[in-house]
Amino acid sequence: IRQRLFLGELPRESVLETEHGFLVTSPLLTAFIMSRHLTDLQLLFVLAEMCGLFAVCALPVALEAELSRAIDSGAISTTFGWVRCPSEDGITSSLWRRDALVLGRDLDRFCSDVCGMRYGNRFMAVSQLVPLGAASPFEVEAYLLLGLPRALGGEGFCGIELNVEVTLSTSARAIVGKSHVYIDLLLSSPDGRRQVAIECQGKASHGRAGDGLRDADRMTALQAMGYDVLLLTHRQISDEDRFRAIVKAVCRMLDAEYRDKSSDEQRAEALLR
């Protein structure tokens, strides 16, 4: 245990009581304390996970066994809202689904409380870049590569929305058998007249392997609703040339001009992968 001295008034709701008789720091205060040891990019990923609908948690073998015993014996009835995502290779997954630990308004309030503190302005600046409600690490990576300013390695697409609910028309419902679907990432042109839906593929790692919709069905249903749809894979964002082709396709769909990156911007992009 390392002791930390926090001078001044603590941010609101930054210390939480537990039923076990001890106090814990809130997720945001924990991230703030950690931030002095993290790069801006590392802090951004930490906050994105806290504000997302997923967690990456690889349990040690002993703890995994203890958790199974506790559930089987009835000592705990559930994993308290955490659901492990299936993996394609049958190995126990370290990716979990859960509700967001931090909402956008929580992040805004915390930033207003730490503004002016040491590391506070940096924390606030990084928080402005955090995607809210991402469903997987893949969505976070795709969002950052597409949405961050070009100086930080992204493509500078503005106003990207995550997990947008789309209510389907009668004809689109007939394709998927559902009344609505979710778009992983929705990009819009500055005038709002053109939109591109990006579907993140690789559902086991993406976090929605059991959503009951085949990729082709969802893509066809969204196209029936008038959306341009692109499928995005890990392989595509990992390969610079493949990803560049995707970006150029998005620019064409949004009627936006593509501009080659400078050497500094390319180096910043490499850090995001």
Label every model-predicted segment.
Residues 1-119, 271-273:
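Short gly/ser-rich loop at a beta-strand->alpha-helix junction or flexible surface loop bordering the NTP-binding
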Residues 70-76, 80-273:
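Surface segments flanking catalytic/ligand-binding clefts of nucleic-acid enzymes
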